[in-house]
Amino acid sequence: MLPFVQERIGLFIVNFFIFTVVCAITLLVCMAFLTATRLCVQCMTGFNTLLVQPALYLYNTGRSVYVKFQDSKPPLPPDEWV
């Protein structure tokens, strides 16, 4: 074979290797970003399920009980108790 052809084949192999490495690194970076995003979403969902929802439930229940008992106040004590 001519030296020019061997040089072109070698250049093609080197370029293909560089392209493969760049694609692999890009793929790894994208996978790491997507995995981190998914982990953040799962943590937010767990935080919402374990802390926010029970807190809202307790707050709403306490508020409804407070409103319910605000409407029915106990009678004042007799005057002789004062």
Curated annotation (Swiss-Prot):
The chain crosses the membrane at residues 17-37. The gene is E. Keywords: Apoptosis, Host Golgi apparatus, Host membrane, Membrane, Transmembrane, Transmembrane helix. It is found in: Host Golgi apparatus membrane. It is a single-pass type III membrane protein. Gene3D superfamilies: 6.10.250.1810. It comes from the Viruses. Homopentamer. Interacts with membrane protein M in the budding compartment of the host cell, which is located between endoplasmic reticulum and the Golgi complex. Interacts with Nucleoprotein. GO terms for cellular component: host cell Golgi apparatus; host cell Golgi membrane; membrane. Belongs to the betacoronaviruses E protein family. InterPro entries: E_MERS-CoV-like, E_protein_bCoV, E_protein_CoV. This is Envelope small membrane protein. GO terms for biological process: disruption of cellular anatomical structure in another organism; viral budding from Golgi membrane. Residues 38-78 are intravirion. Residues 1-16 are virion surface. Plays a central role in virus morphogenesis and assembly. Acts as a viroporin and self-assembles in host membranes forming pentameric protein-lipid pores that allow ion transport. Also plays a role in the induction of apoptosis.
